[in-house]
């Protein structure tokens, strides 16, 4: 088996908050960006940037460009805002993973890389928390 017959894999970094979704495909080292897309690149309204529809469109665009550059499969790293903010990914995360698979990309590992504090900064909201 020659060296050029080897399949090329990448990493799909999906940042999904409740305001936006950003998908970046890098090489396996994570140093070189192959392609990226965000909610504002595919929809007009700000409120739709985090929607599953926008995530599906972004994933399809990203998958097409990545396949042109020779990437056949991706390992997925899902990230939410984390730290003192929301620790669960937004609505676009699952739709993006599903759309990547539908676009013909092979999915390797799916990993949650949300930053979780080990008792560092005091969360905002004061002593009694946020009162609604």
From Swiss-Prot:
Example of a GO cellular component annotation carried by this entry: ribosome
Residues spanning the membrane: none
Record has rRNA-binding as a keyword: yes
Recorded GO MF terms: rRNA binding; structural constituent of ribosome
One matching Pfam family: Ribosomal_S11
Keyword Ribonucleoprotein: yes
Keywords: Ribonucleoprotein, Ribosomal protein, RNA-binding, rRNA-binding
Region annotation (Disordered) ranges: 108-132
Gene Ontology process terms (BP): translation
Function as written in the Swiss-Prot or TrEMBL entry: Located on the platform of the 30S subunit.
Family statement: Belongs to the universal ribosomal protein uS11 family.
Complex and partners: Part of the 30S ribosomal subunit.
PANTHER family to which the protein is assigned, alphabetical: 40S RIBOSOMAL PROTEIN S14/30S RIBOSOMAL PROTEIN S11
NCBIfam families cross-referenced by the UniProt entry: arch_S11P, PRK09607.1
Identification of the protein by name: Small ribosomal subunit protein uS11
Native source species: Methanoregula boonei (strain DSM 21154 / JCM 14090 / 6A8)
């Amino acid at each position: 088996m020659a060296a050029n017959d080897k399949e090329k894999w990448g990493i799909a970094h999906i940042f999904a908050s409740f305001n936006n979704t950003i998908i970046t495909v890098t090489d396996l080292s994570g140093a070189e960006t192959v392609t990226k897309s965000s909610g504002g690149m595919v929809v007009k309204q700000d409120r739709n940037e985090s929607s599953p529809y926008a995530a599906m469109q972004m994933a399809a665009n990203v998958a097409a460009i990545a396949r042109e550059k020779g990437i056949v499969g991706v390992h997925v790293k899902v990230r939410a805002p984390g730290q003192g903010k929301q620790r669960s990914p937004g609505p676009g995360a699952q739709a993006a993973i599903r759309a990547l698979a539908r676009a013909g990309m092979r999915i390797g590992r799916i990993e949650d890389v949300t930053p979780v504090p080990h008792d560092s900064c005091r969360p905002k909201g004061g002593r009694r928390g946020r009162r609604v």
